[in-house]
């Protein structure tokens, strides 16, 4: 695979691969400029294309690429919680933030009449590439206590958390609408520790889903709204 850039000798293979997919475009003057920093807009453009957005159709190239990129990325939530100007070079922390947000947007399957069409199953980079899904529910028991039992002896084993009204979202996007989830009929006990102050709270978990939901690897859990 060959790119249009003449200065990618150090890491030529994967830079050229990204060129071939349209994820990167260099400076537009035949140079990739590998030693330069990356701005928020530049990173967002790469992440958008990785999620399936067409750079040409979305206007992410040409003189107005930065404006169009910032607009689309903001709409999709890629810049959520970013306090720095999107045209500034990214810190490592802010780069991680943008990547985290981009993992949570729906992937694009195709374009029809110039409009981006997402997959019917609302897949995201997070679910497609890593098998990670969003789960919501109310914590009703953990190693500290169970809500229906006040005796501490009735608490669950260490490293266990019981959730009721569990919803498994088909998409991990923060903008998922009602109807895009499957609700479990019975409480589910997950293999994860949670603090006592989560009891009675509605929480979100990110899990690497297995056939049996209770056996899924829990990657993170937080109280909704935090």
Which residues are covered by each model-predicted region?
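Single conserved hydrophobic/aromatic residue that forms the stacking wall/gate
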Residues: 1-5, 9
């Amino acid at each position: 695979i060959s790119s249009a850039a003449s200065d990618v000798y150090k890491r030529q293979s994967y830079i050229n691969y990204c060129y071939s997919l349209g994820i990167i475009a260099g400076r537009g003057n035949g140079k990739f400029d590998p030693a330069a920093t990356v701005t928020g807009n530049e990173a967002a453009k790469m992440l958008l294309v990785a999620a399936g957005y067409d750079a040409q159709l979305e206007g992410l190239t040409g003189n107005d690429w930065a404006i169009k990129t910032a607009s689309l990325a903001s709409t999709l939530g890629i810049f959520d919680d970013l306090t720095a100007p999107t045209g500034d070079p990214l810190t490592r922390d802010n780069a991680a933030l943008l990547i985290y947000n981009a993992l949570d947007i729906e992937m694009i399957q195709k374009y029809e009449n110039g409009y981006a069409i997402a997959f019917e199953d609302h897949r995201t980079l997070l679910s497609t590439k890593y098998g990670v899904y969003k789960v919501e529910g109310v914590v009703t028991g953990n190693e500290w206590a169970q809500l229906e039992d006040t005796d501490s002896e009735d608490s669950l084993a260490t490293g266990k958390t019981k959730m009721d009204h569990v919803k498994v979202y088909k998409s991990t996007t923060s903008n998922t609408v009602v109807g895009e989830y499957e609700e479990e009929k019975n409480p589910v006990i997950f293999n994860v520790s949670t603090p006592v102050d989560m009891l009675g709270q509605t929480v979100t978990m990110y899990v690497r889903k297995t056939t049996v939901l209770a056996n899924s690897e829990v990657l993170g859990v937080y109280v909704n709204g935090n």
